[in-house]
């Protein structure tokens, strides 16, 4: 599996975001095993244990922009029970949160505030872009709306829909957990490579492309 390596670039200008240099590399743990099998296996076990704890205890930041936020909060109700995934502890401060959900329309005036909130979150941190407006601007192709929050934030998971159902948000959360389980992060600021290795995860659209094309018994609009 290919990984995307991101390193901090101290010489980057302040307006560049995310600040870092990216390149496609192989799994660093496999390279470590080839060099020293004992240390490589030990690092693999430690990394797996740390990632397991991170992905099963994700604290979301209580933040919303538009109607998609209503669908996100619905996922916290009893019928959906987001507590099954360990993500029910909503934080009122970005300094205590693990991930942020950009749910709704992001206006240009709001972009600096969102970026400031993201910068206040401590590492490791992740971003879920929820809804068509957050993903690409949606139907608001106008001067006042940012055409996708990935213009100024590093997005980990995109949840399509206008607005997405709570089930779609839960699937996005599970995809984020899967991605976190395969991440390679430094165990300490003084131990190991300080770069962040993220697995190159294929999109669900591409994974199900052949399955959807093979469908021939299409239902009428009255039956959907």
From Swiss-Prot:
Catalytic activity: a quinone + NADH + 5 H(+)(in) = a quinol + NAD(+) + 4 H(+)(out)
Record keywords, A-Z: 4Fe-4S, Cell inner membrane, Cell membrane, Iron, Iron-sulfur, Membrane, Metal-binding, NAD, Quinone, Translocase, Transport, Ubiquinone
GO molecular function: 4 iron, 4 sulfur cluster binding; iron ion binding; NADH dehydrogenase (ubiquinone) activity; NADH:ubiquinone reductase (non-electrogenic) activity; quinone binding
Chief site of localization: membrane
EC number(s) recorded for this UniProt protein: 7.1.1.-
InterPro entries noted in UniProt: NADH_UbQ_OxRdtase-like_20kDa, NADH_UQ_OxRdtase_20Kd_su
Keyword Iron-sulfur: yes
Protein name: NADH-quinone oxidoreductase subunit B
Phylogenetic lineage: Bacteria, Pseudomonadati, Pseudomonadota, Gammaproteobacteria, Pseudomonadales
């Amino acid at each position: 599996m290919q990984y995307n390596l991101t390193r901090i670039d101290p010489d980057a200008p302040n307006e560049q975001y995310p600040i870092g240099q990216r390149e496609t590399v192989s799994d660093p743990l496999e390279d470590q095993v080839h060099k020293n099998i004992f240390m490589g296996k030990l690092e693999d076990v430690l990394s797996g244990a740390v990632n397991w704890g991170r992905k099963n205890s994700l604290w979301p930041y209580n933040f919303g922009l538009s109607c998609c936020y209503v669908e996100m909060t619905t996922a916290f109700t009893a019928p959906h029970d987001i507590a099954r995934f360990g993500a029910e502890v909503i934080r009122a401060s970005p300094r205590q949160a693990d991930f942020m959900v950009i749910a709704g329309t992001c206006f240009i005036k709001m972009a600096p505030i969102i970026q400031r909130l993201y910068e206040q979150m401590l590492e490791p941190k992740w971003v879920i872009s929820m809804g068509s407006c957050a993903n690409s601007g949606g139907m608001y192709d106008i001067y006042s709306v940012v055409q996708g929050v990935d213009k100024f934030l590093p997005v980990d998971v995109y949840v399509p829909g206008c607005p997405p159902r709570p089930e779609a948000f839960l699937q996005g959360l599970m995809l984020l957990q899967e991605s976190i389980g395969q991440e390679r992060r430094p165990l300490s600021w003084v131990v190991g490579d300080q770069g962040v290795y993220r697995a190159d995860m294929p999109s669900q659209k591409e994974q199900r492309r052949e399955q959807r094309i093979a469908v021939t018994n299409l239902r009428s609009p009255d039956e959907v």
